Amino acid sequence: MSIEILIIDDNADIRNIINDLIIDAGFKTRLAANYNQALNEIDKKLPDVAIIDV
């Protein structure tokens, strides 16, 4: 079973850097740029972990 991480950050560059690092570490990721996208991703499937830029 692979851990799935939801990355939520409005800055695309930062979001993609974090995404690349996490994928390289062997985890699955999903991305969201804002609150609405994050809720849509959570509604699809609850992630194991969320990294949130506040």
Where are the language model's segments positioned?
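Two-component/phosphorelay signaling modules centered on CheY-like receiver
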Residues: A12-R30
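Acidic, metal-coordinating helix/loop segments flanking the phosphotransfer/catalytic sites
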Residues: L31-V49
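Residues in flexible loops and secondary-structure boundaries
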Residues: N16, A25, L39-N40, A50
